[in-house]
Amino acid sequence: LVKGEAGAGKTVLMSSLVDDLLNSEDISFIKDNNYINLIVNHNNQLSVYKEIERKLNWNSGSSLEVAMKPTQFLNALRKEKIKAGVVIVDEGHLLLTAKNQAYLGGNHLIDLLAQSKVVVLVYDDKQIMNKSQIWTDNTFFELEHEANLEGNLIELRNQMRIKANPETVNWIRRIIDDCEIKKLTKDKQYDIRIFDSPFELQKAIKLKNKDQKLGISRLVATYDWPYVEEKKKQDRPKWFVEIGDWKAPWNQQIKPEKKDAKLSWIEQPQTIDEIGSTFTVQGFDLNYAGVIIGPSVKYRNGKIMFDISESKNKGAVQNRKLENGEMKNFGEDLLKNELNVLLTRGVNGLYIYAVDEELQEALKEAIL
């Protein structure tokens, strides 16, 4: 079990571990006796791993591809009547802990443990996004305790993504973890700005994106405006983030060029005109992240609060049925996790616009 906050380097560690398992002479004996697979329950992350798999010519050792989503992988094991060897799970917090229409098991991790010799799981409970990913009993704590007793619990403590001084990293973490906005002295290394309008924010991010020496810059937002994924791409966008007389389309609506279709959302050039969400940016680095904080995040009486009535993320704000049949709402925690993911994408800068006037004012006053 490998634990680490957003930006701790979990994905880099996992992809290099898989590559070592598949290609290193020193540990070739592991591959000789085991199938090697990399599992991630996130479409855009999967597309990146698929590209690595193709370029590096990865071979799992079985009839299955190396990189797969968990439900697809478990179904394939059943169909092929084989057991897994070493299974590396990236973004382990996105595994399901409840069945749905496509997945009839009760818990992805429990099923993976039952079907594999070794599972390496990367995990951050502050990045759980959906009620169906929450552990509603003590099973995960028991697994964590067991891993710790056996010396199999690793914690990544360094911040590898955000290239800022510790005060700036702490300022961002205080917003997320403590719901507090403290004063922040300007950081020469890391550019944090609060914009007066979404127009200005969009313009600034587009300008940053023109120079991609340090990476791609994109606009993202909390899921506070309606969006339904269309099975078939429409000729023109249908779902928008709208603030006053400004609007921009939600992610995955502008058709990519054919050559870019298999790339992740952030790597497709046309997405500079769209607004990303946790569904498209979780797990990724951006050079500059432009974050629109929607009306579900408010600032009242010196504290940030989360208003589930303003969120359009049904998977986060609807009740979850517990083992005893009781219904429980985890919405506020999940909206906090959503903000965590969005505010921790930028490597060199974070640009913000907040819809809530009191939040916007508090953020502007905080930056000295």
Give the positions of each predicted feature.
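Hydrophobic anchor at the beta1->P-loop junction of P-loop NTPases
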Residues: 2
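Conserved lysine of the Walker
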Residues: 10
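Hydrophobic positions on the alpha1 helix immediately C-terminal to the Walker A/P-loop
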Residues: 13, 17
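Conserved Walker A/P-loop ATP-binding site and its immediately adjacent core
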Residues: 32-51
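Conserved RecA-like ASCE ATPase "motif II neighborhood" in helicase/translocase motors
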Residues: 56-115, 273-277, 338
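Signature of the SF2 helicase/ATPase Hel1-core->accessory helical subdomain module
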Residues: 88-156
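C-terminal accessory regions
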Residues: 120, 269-368
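Conserved helicase/translocase motor-coupling segment
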Residues: 129-135, 145, 149-169, 177-303
